[in-house]
Amino acid sequence: MASLSPPDLGSVVHTAAEEADILMLQELVSIESLSRHESSAVAFLRGAMAARGFRVEQDAVGNAVGTIGSGERHIVLLGHIDTVTGHPPVKIEDGVLWGRGAVDAKGPLATFVAAASAAAADLKVKVTVVGAIGEEAIHSLGATEVANWPAPAFCIIGEPSGWDSLCLGYRGSLSLIYRLQTDMRHTAGPGESVAEQAVAFWNGVLAEVAARNEGAKNLFESIGPGLRSFNTSSDGLSETAELSIGLRLPPDLDVPELLQRVEALAGEGQITVDGMQEGYRTTKQSKLVPPFLRAIRDEGGTPRFKVKLGTSDMNVVGPNWKCPIAAYGPGDSSLDHTPEERIDLSEYLRAIRVLRNVLISFS
């Protein structure tokens, strides 16, 4: 890991514990951890948790796992340690930490570690923090492994909701590959080229989605189509078109029926499912909600509820565990995956205090 420049925290005076929490996040963000290349960050996180009194391990797929406290009830704080590509310089200026993962989602993950260790003396429950690998990849390998655990009493997903907000749901996703191969033809001859047929298929998908979205109350309840890539190739005898397609799915959508319709639109083309996560949503009546409302208000905030248009590991563990679940963490999610990714450290510290009080309330 590269040496870190001294942070510019502005005029704010922090306690020793707050400075340690800021340094932990800065160091974690400084370690590049693309999906499938998280081992260095996992090793750092395990060390940081061990230094704070966690019982640490690395599971079969490479997740960082740390447990603190004891009791009959088990609380899982499931964050992810991988990031998307791009590693802008890590710096702290005027109380703001810049760098890939500061928001999505090392900020929420560091919040989990800091809050659980701060609550340790008052815990009467077992709290497990997971720094999961592979969340930014299609198959969410880390969360898929964790989903095999016995269901906990509560689960909190580490994603940037904002310190004063709770996220109650995420759309799902369906990743598809469309492939069409035809015999070569002269461009002056009759008929459509393989590229033209692929375009016609994609336009058919857009029309199908538009028809299904009629009457949707909002974007969360609609299907979101995306064309990720379009490639054509030829070997002189045949020509091939391949499209990579992503569909964002609202909860309760009949995914097999939608897939059947897409396959019909493909005609002679082949459809391969490259990954699928169904949408998932909980309610304001969840037993997780009241402790967060109290803790946010105690910090001077006005609690808000959100649902997100993307996916998270809630989509993976929620259907398996069926326990009270929500996503929480500091940060502005509109900065996810952008060159401007950054987190206000005062918000980070506030989120730590909120989550600490939530964990103590379970005791």
What are the residue ranges of the model-derived segments?
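Hydrophobic/aromatic beta-strand patches that form the interior of the parallel beta-sheet core
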Residues: 75-77, 130, 154-156, 228, ...
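Acidic/histidine-rich catalytic neighborhood of metal-dependent amide-processing enzymes
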Residues: 110-175
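Acidic/His- and Gly-rich active-site-bordering loop/insert found
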Residues: 2-102, 123, 322
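Metal-dependent amide/peptide-bond hydrolase catalytic core
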Residues: 2-9, 57, 160, 174-363
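Buried hydrophobic packing segments
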Residues: 45, 109-119, 143-146, 198-202, ...
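Active-site nucleophile and cofactor-binding loops and adjacent substrate-binding regions
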Residues: 97-105, 304-310
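Short beta-strand/turn micro-motifs at beta-sheet edges
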Residues: 87-88, 164-168, 230-235
